[in-house]
Regions:
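Positively charged n-region of N-terminal signal peptides that target proteins for export
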Residues: 1-4, 11
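C-terminal motif of bacterial Sec signal peptides marking the signal peptidase cleavage site
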Residues: 16-20
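Bacterial signal peptide processing site
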Residues: 22-25
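Surface-exposed, low-hydrophobicity interaction/linker segments
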Residues: 35-94, 114, 118
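A short, solvent-exposed beta-edge/loop patch
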Residues: 95, 107, 132-176
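A short acidic-to-branched-hydrophobic micro-motif
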Residues: 99-110
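Short amphipathic alpha-helices in soluble, non-transmembrane regions
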Residues: 117-124, 162-168
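An anionic, turn-rich surface loop/hairpin at beta-sheet edges
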Residues: 118-139
């Protein structure tokens, strides 16, 4: 009787172990239409792969700041008048203001048209936002829910296209470049 009970318990234990280790699919934490990682992380990775020859830093853009200063920060960084089309934004710029370089990355809110947001960014940004210098090369690209606007002064031996190429390696192959 003890052997019979031991065999039944052993079989039950084996079945429970096998069913517990069965191949279940992991739960997806992001939608297939979303790029993984924060825009700050993505910007830092782009700069790590496409280095610049100046000290710069990534700053998060507060999309909830409705003050005049907050709205100016959103407009001068993204070119957008309406931050409601975004869920997050960050910018990489030089620590010295006399270098014309700005790389901004935004995550577009669900339901918004990513290409329309990109076009609004390009038409709304001021390439002369610095006092004495101007960006003469600008591109906007996007993949899934992320848009990157890069503008720079080519006298620093940089091109916007090189950053778009790096965007493709870090974020995903661009769906458009404008």
């Amino acid at each position: 009787m003890k052997k019979y009970l031991s065999v039944i318990l052993a079989a039950a234990l084996a079945l429970s172990l096998l069913s517990g280790c069965a191949g279940s699919k992991p739960t997806e934490t992001t939608s297939p239409d979303q790029v993984e990682g924060t825009v700050e992380e993505l910007l830092n990775e782009i700069v790590a792969q496409q280095p610049v020859e100046f000290d710069g830093g990534v700053e998060t853009i507060d999309l909830t700041d409705t003050s005049e200063e907050g709205q100016w920060a959103i407009k001068s960084s993204t070119g957008l008048d309406n931050a409601g089309v975004l869920t997050e934004a960050a910018v990489f710029e030089p620590m010295i203001g006399s270098i014309a370089f700005s790389m901004v990355m935004v995550r577009v809110a669900p339901g918004e048209d990513i290409k329309s947001v990109a076009e609004a960014m390009k038409s709304g940004i001021n390439p002369r936002k610095w006092v004495c210098v101007e960006a003469d090369d600008m591109l906007v690209t996007g993949y899934r829910d992320v848009v990157m606007l890069i503008m720079l002064d080519t006298s620093y031996d940089l091109t916007a296209q090189s950053f778009v190429d790096t965007f493709g390696k870090v974020v995903g192959e661009p769906e458009f470049v404008i």
